[in-house]
Curated annotation (Swiss-Prot):
PTM sites of type Phosphothreonine: T197
Protein name: Chaperone protein dnaK1
Keyword Disulfide bond: no
Organism, as annotated: Synechocystis sp. (strain ATCC 27184 / PCC 6803 / Kazusa)
Stored PANTHER family: HEAT SHOCK PROTEIN 70KDA
Pfam families xrefs: HSP70
Function text: Acts as a chaperone.
Family (UniProt): Belongs to the heat shock protein 70 family.
Annotated InterPro entries: ATPase_NBD, Chaperone_DnaK, Heat_shock_70_CS, HSP70_peptide-bd_sf, Hsp_70_fam
GO MF assignments: ATP binding; ATP hydrolysis activity; ATP-dependent protein folding chaperone; heat shock protein binding; protein folding chaperone; unfolded protein binding
Classification via NCBIfam families: PRK00290.1 (NF001413), PRK13411.1 (NF009947), prok_dnaK (TIGR02350)
A GO BP entry: protein refolding
Top-rank lineage group of the source organism: Bacteria
Length: 692
C-alpha cells in the first residue's frame, strides 16, 4: 500500500503531511512553501491556477479568482447571504438550493473548487514522495455538519483520492501535540482559530488514548473576519476623506483585503503599521492614493466584538465537559489567527493557571495530526486510540412537534442508536420521519436535517405497528437514519448529505435559547404531554363505551361525560393553566379506571385488553408521535382482577411479572417512592415504574 497523506483543507491555506519513520512531516509544495493558499484562479486563456500563483494574480483578476470556498461547501443558498456579499466572484444558486460559482460562463460547485486545491496538494505530495498518492485523511472543523463533511469527502473523491477518514481539526491538532506524550495524563484544550472557522475541543490524554470530552465552536469566525473589519475601516475612512466609495470596485476591494491581511500579520509583532496603496482609484481630478496608519490598539478596538465572540465556545466546552478552567493543564494554540496578541490575551485571562502551548506550528498542527491518524489507520502508529464526539444532539420530531432525542450531543462516535415507535392514529399507513438537530424541546426551534416517508404500513389500530428507527453516525461524523416496519420488513433510509449547514450564530443562538427558554420549553412540553394523554383518554373512553357501554351504570356514564366535557373545554381554551389541565386529566383518568373495573367485573374480562392498553397509553405520559413498544413478556395479574397482558407498559417499563414496583405519584395513601409488590394486594391506580 502506498503512502497515506494527511490534509488540512483550510479556508485560507491548506497543508499536507505524511508519516516518515513514525514521525509526521510537512510536505513542501512545488513553490517551496509549507502551506498552500486555498485559492483557485481562472485566467483569460482558460488556464487554471491554484495556490500561490492564483493569489498573485487575484488583484487584477478578482472576479475570476475563488477563495474561502470552504465557507460555502455543503451549505444552502439562503444560509450564505453574508458570505456571498463579501466575495468578488459571482455566486449562483446551484442544484438542491446549494451555492455554485460562475466563472467565465461555467458553473463550479464548492466541491469541484475544493477538489482543485486537493489535486494540487496530491500532485505536490507525489512529487515530494516520488510515488503515486491515492489515499488521504482530510480534516474538517469540529462543527461541520453532516452535509459539509459529506461534501468534503466528495471533493476528495473528485480529486482522485480515497478519503479513508474525515476527522475534526482540533482533534487532529491534539494528536500532533500528544503523540510523544502518551505516558502523560493531561487535560488539554485545543483552541483552533483559523482563516474561516473557530473550534474548541476539550480532551483527556493518557496511555495513548485521546478522548474528546466536549467540543464547541463557530463555523463563521476566523482570520477572514478580522481582515474584513480592517477592510471596512479603510473603505469608510477613504470615503470620508475622498468621497469615493471603494466597496463597489472589486479590484480595489481585493487590494484592500490583501493590505488588511498584511497589516494584521504585522501587528502581531509590531505596535504600528502603515498601509500604503498607491493608485487605489481615480476621479476627474486624477489618481487617488490610500495611506493610513493603523495601531495595534486600534486594530483591537475594530475587532473587539470578534474577540468577545471567542469566549462563548470556551465557556460552552467547559460546561459540556463539566470541567473548571483551573483543571485544564495546557491550551494548544492552532491556526494562524492565534498569533494575534489580543487572542492570546483572551485565552490567558480565561485560563490563568494553564500553559499556552506553541510547540507545534499553528499552521501545520492539524495536517500533522491528520498524518498521524493516517498512520493509525495504516498500522504504522500503534497504541493510539482516538475517541471523537458529535457536537449537537440528533433526533426526531414526534407527536405535537416535540423533539425526541436519539443521540445526545458530545456522544462518542462512531455510534448507533435505535428506538421502536408506533403510529399515532388508527389506520395510519405511512409515517414521516423528520430528522432534526439541536437542543430545544420543540422541533420547530431546532435545525431540520431532512425528511423521508415510510409507506406501506398495513392499517391497524394506533400503537400496534412497530417501527424501528435507527440513527448511525460513522467515524467520519456522517449520519444515516433508517426506519423499518417490523411487521412487513419494509425499510427506508436517508443519508444526510444535501442539507444546509448551521452557522456559528445559529449554533450559539440555539444553545443560548435552550438555556434561556428552558422553563418555557418544559411548560410547552408538559402541555403537549397532557394534550396527548387527554387524546388517549378520549379514545379509550369512547372505545370502552362502544364495546361494553351496557355494563356501565348510568350514573358512572354521566360522571364520565361530565369529566370528558370539562377536559375538552379546557383543551380548547387558550392559556389554560397546566395545573388545572393536569387535574382534569387525572380526574378523567380515574373515572375511566372505575368504568374499566366495572366493565370487567360485570363482563368477566370483556374489557381487559382495552383497559391494559389504557394503562399503557396514559400512565407513561408519552409525548411521542409514535409510542415506544415492547412485547413477548409474561403476563401479570393484580388482585383486583385486572389482567396486564404481555407487553403492557407502566410508565414506559414492561411488566415482567413478580417485580417490585415503586409509585411515582403520591396518591391513594402511598408515599412517593413507597414500594409494594405488584402481584400482591394492590390495584394499579397511578403511574408506577420498575425498580431493581
Amino acid at each position: 500500500m502506498g503512502k497515506v497523506i494527511g490534509i488540512d483543507l483550510g479556508t485560507t491555506n491548506s497543508c499536507a503531511s505524511v508519516l516518515e519513520g513514525g514521525k509526521p512531516i510537512v510536505i513542501t509544495n512545488t513553490e517551496g512553501g509549507r502551506t498552500t493558499p486555498s485559492i483557485v484562479g481562472f485566467t483569460k486563456g482558460s488556464q487554471r491556477l491554484v495556490g500561490q500563483l492564483a493569489k498573485r494574480q487575484s488583484v487584477t483578476n478578482a472576479e475570476n479568482t475563488v477563495y474561502s470556498i470552504k465557507r460555502f461547501i455543503g451549505r444552502r443558498w439562503d444560509d450564505t447571504v453574508e458570505e456571498r456579499s463579501r466575495v468578488p466572484y459571482n455566486c449562483v444558486k446551484g442544484r438542491d438550493d446549494t451555492v455554485s460559482v460562475s466563472i467565465r460562463g461555467q458553473s463550479y460547485t464548492p466541491q469541484e473548487i475544493s477538489a482543485m486545491i486537493l489535486q494540487k496538494l496530491k500532485a505536490d505530495s507525489e512529487a515530494f514522495l516520488g510515488e503515486p498518492v491515492t489515499q488521504a485523511v482530510i480534516t474538517v472543523p469540529a462543527y461541520f455538519t453532516d452535509a459539509q463533511r459529506q461534501a468534503t469527502k466528495d471533493a476528495g473523491t473528485i480529486a482522485g483520492l480515497e478519503v479513508l477518514r474525515i476527522i475534526n481539526e482540533p482533534t487532529a491538532a491534539a494528536l500532533a501535540y500528544g503523540l510523544d506524550k502518551q505516558e502523560t495524563e493531561e487535560l488539554i484544550l485545543v483552541f483552533d482559530l483559523g482563516g474561516g472557522t473557530f473550534d474548541v475541543s476539550l480532551l483527556q490524554l493518557g496511555n495513548g488514548v485521546f478522548e474528546v470530552l466536549s467540543t464547541s465552536g463557530n463555523n463563521h469566525l476566523g482570520g477572514d473576519d478580522f481582515d474584513n473589519c480592517v477592510v471596512q475601516w479603510m473603505a469608510e475612512s477613504f470615503k470620508q476623506k475622498e468621497n469615493i466609495d471603494l466597496s463597489t470596485d472589486k479590484m480595489a476591494i481585493q487590494r484592500l483585503r490583501e493590505a488588511a491581511e498584511k497589516a494584521k500579520i504585522e501587528l502581531s509583532s509590531m505596535l504600528n503599521t502603515t498601509i500604503n496603496l498607491p493608485f487605489i482609484t481615480a476621479d476627474e481630478s486624477g489618481p487617488k492614493h490610500l495611506e493610513m496608519e493603523l495601531a495595534r490598539s486600534q486594530f483591537e478596538e475594530l475587532t473587539k466584538q470578534l474577540l468577545e465572540d471567542t469566549r462563548v465556545p470556551l465557556t460552552q466546552a467547559l460546561d459540556d465537559g463539566e470541567i473548571r478552567a483551573s483543571d485544564v493543564h495546557r491550551v494548544i494554540l492552532v491556526g494562524g489567527s492565534t498569533r494575534i496578541p489580543a487572542i492570546q490575551r483572551v485565552i490567558q485571562e480565561f485560563f490563568p493557571d494553564s500553559q499556552l502551548e506553541r510547540s507545534v506550528n499553528p499552521d501545520e498542527a492539524v495536517a500533522l495530526g491528520a498524518a498521524i491518524q493516517a498512520g493509525v489507520i495504516g498500522g504504522e502508529v500503534e497504541d493510539v486510540l482516538l475517541l471523537d464526539v458529535t457536537p449537537l444532539s440528533l433526533g426526531l420530531e414526534t407527536l405535537g412537534e416535540v423533539t425526541t432525542k436519539i443521540i445526545e450531543r458530545n456522544t462518542t462516535i462512531p455510534t448507533s442508536r435505535s428506538e421502536v415507535f408506533s403510529t399515532a392514529v388508527d389506520g395510519q399507513t405511512s409515517v414521516e420521519i423528520h430528522v432534526i438537530q439541536g437542543e430545544r424541546a420543540m422541533a420547530r426551534d431546532n435545525k431540520s436535517l431532512g425528511k423521508f416517508l415510510l409507506a406501506g404500513i398495513p392499517p391497524a389500530p394506533r400503537g400496534m405497528p412497530q417501527i424501528e428507527v435507527s440513527f448511525e453516525i460513522d467515524v467520519n461524523g456522517i449520519l444515516k437514519v433508517s426506519a423499518q416496519d417490523q411487521g412487513t420488513g419494509k425499510e427506508q433510509s436517508i443519508v444526510i448529505s444535501h442539507t444546509g449547514g448551521l452557522s456559528g450564530g445559529e449554533i450559539e443562538k440555539m444553545r443560548q435559547e435552550a438555556q434561556q427558554y428552558a422553563a418555557q420549553d418544559q411548560l410547552r412540553l408538559r402541555m403537549m404531554e397532557l394534550q396527548n394523554q387527554a387524546d388517549s383518554l378520549f379514545h379509550t373512553y369512547e372505545t370502552t363505551l362502544q364495546e361494553s357501554g351496557e355494563l356501565v351504570r348510568e350514573e358512572l356514564k354521566s360522571s364520565g361525560k361530565q369529566k370528558k366535557d370539562q377536559l375538552a373545554i379546557a383543551l380548547r381554551t387558550p392559556n389554560t393553566p397546566v395545573e388545572k389541565l393536569q387535574t382534569l386529566v387525572e380526574e378523567f383518568r380515574q373515572i375511566i379506571l372505575l368504568i374499566g373495573t366495572e366493565v370487567y367485573q360485570q363482563g368477566k374480562g370483556a374489557a381487559s385488553n382495552e383497559f391494559a392498553n389504557f394503562v399503557q397509553g396514559t400512565s407513561s405520559g408519552t409525548s411521542q408521535m409514535i409510542e415506544s413498544l415492547e412485547t413477548n413478556l409474561n403476563p401479570i395479574q393484580a388482585s383486583s382482577g385486572i389482567t396486564m397482558t404481555p407487553g403492557t407498559m407502566i410508565n414506559g417499563t414492561v411488566n415482567p411479572g413478580g417485580m417490585d414496583y415503586v409509585e411515582t405519584a403520591p396518591v391513594y395513601g402511598l408515599d412517593d417512592g413507597e414500594e409494594f409488590d405488584f402481584d400482591a394486594d394492590e390495584t394499579v391506580y397511578s403511574d408506577y415504574e420498575a425498580i431493581d
